[in-house]
Amino acid sequence: MGFNINIIGTGGTRPLHNRYLSSVLIEYDGDNFLFDCGEGTQMSLRKQKISWQKIKMICITHLHADHITGLLGIVMLMSQSGETRKEPLIIAGPVGIKNYTQANINMLKIYKNYEIIYKEIIIDKTEKIIYEDKTKKIEYTKLKHSIECVGYLFIEKDKPGKFNTEKAEELNIPKGPIRKALQDGKEILVNGKIIKPSEILGKSKKGLKVAYITDTGYFKELIQQIKNFNLVIIESTFKNELKKEADKKLHLTAGGAANIVKQAKVLQTGLIHFSERYTLRKDLENLLKEAKLEHPDGEIFLTRDGMRLEANKNNFIIK
């Protein structure tokens, strides 16, 4: 339970022996949300002892192979793991995600004993919120890449403050559903008097905001979308010396990623989606150095396969 983030993979283009393709799983009070699903994702999930059966929703950023080729394996395994899913699997992504998935299911004759709900995103037209319940919501944000691509914003809703039982007794508010309504932020009517939640509840706790941003080139609009986020996991594909290549391919350098989060005043930043050319630890450490040179006051770190981050007040602790 709680609010945790598991780094499933951190690479780009192709998996390496010690680095799977970029993928992140967010756990929130028993609900699991997977962001991107490249080749080898199921292997990394298995290594981290994370059940794919517990994945509620898979959010794909774009239809490039290194972000999607692991999807069908997980779709198949959900029907072959010895237990039946009790709820549908939600799959979200840009237009084409449904055709890609269904065509492969049909062509490969994949046995499936559960429902899939597709949420295809038509950028700038589809409602920004693609998932919402009482405690959280997921929004998409447009990215700048060679094909239609979106980032995802995981937003925890503000939590109500402490319920003042003495005040409730004083105002003759009966126990039960009517008190629950106040805790849900609704006004109630007691003895002809309207009572607002603010009269009974203490100060609310601000919810945490997490963004998953890859693949993209630099563009100013992104800064506003992740303004003041608690944690942004953002691509850092190239070293600064390859800025021309990054700009051409619509990717970010380490310095470019740091510049974005600096302007957005992000609290914590995790770098991800490292080029396959960076195979040594020192290569990745150089990416981190370049990011910190651009944003020396920022809390920036390298993500790694198997890393786990746990929510703690207004930030995340690396485990």
From Swiss-Prot:
Keywords, sorted A to Z: Endonuclease, Hydrolase, Metal-binding, Nuclease, tRNA processing, Zinc
Record text on cofactor binding: Binds 2 Zn(2+) ions.
E.C. designation(s): 3.1.26.11
Binding site residues for Zn(2+) 2: D66, H67, D215, H273
Transmembrane segments: none
SMART domains: Lactamase_B
GO molecular function annotations of the record: 3'-tRNA processing endoribonuclease activity; zinc ion binding
Binding site for Zn(2+) 1: H62, H64, H145, D215
The keyword Nuclease belongs to this UniProt entry's keyword annotation: yes
Cofactor(s) it depends on: Zn(2+)
Stored Pfam families: Lactamase_B (PF00753), Lactamase_B_2 (PF12706)
Matching InterPro entries: Metallo-B-lactamas, RibonucZ/Hydroxyglut_hydro, RNase_Z/BN
Reactions it catalyzes: Endonucleolytic cleavage of RNA, removing extra 3' nucleotides from tRNA precursor, generating 3' termini of tRNAs. A 3'-hydroxy group is left at the tRNA terminus and a 5'-phosphoryl group is left at the trailer molecule
Catalytic site positions: D66
Disulfide pairings: none
Protein family (similarity comment): Belongs to the RNase Z family.
Quaternary state and interactors: Homodimer.
Cited function: Zinc phosphodiesterase, which displays some tRNA 3'-processing endonuclease activity. Probably involved in tRNA maturation, by removing a 3'-trailer from precursor tRNA.
NCBIfam families noted in UniProt: PRK00055.1-3, RNase_Z
Name of the protein in question: Ribonuclease Z
Phylogenetic lineage: Bacteria, Pseudomonadati, Spirochaetota, Spirochaetia, Spirochaetales
Gene name tied to this protein: rnz
